[in-house]
């Protein structure tokens, strides 16, 4: 299991940040991803593996005013 934004989700071998975002429907262009508190740059999404037990945070960036 992994935790995504405080909710438990199933984990599978070979899961990447990009695959997780696609599977969970995170399509908003401006997001920040952290895995176990470590920022993951957008260019690394396809390569960054998510391990069983990881804590993933996905945050949408929204400007207000």
Model-derived segments and spans:
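Ubiquitin-like/PB1-type beta-grasp interaction modules and other compact soluble beta-rich domains
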Residues: 1-64
């Amino acid at each position: 299991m992994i935790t995504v934004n405080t909710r438990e989700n199933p984990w599978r071998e070979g899961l990447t940040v990009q695959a997780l975002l696609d599977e969970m429907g995170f399509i908003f262009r401006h997001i920040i991803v952290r895995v176990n508190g470590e920022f993951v740059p957008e260019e690394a999404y396809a390569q960054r593996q998510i391990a069983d037990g990881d804590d993933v945070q996905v945050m949408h960036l929204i400007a207000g005013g």
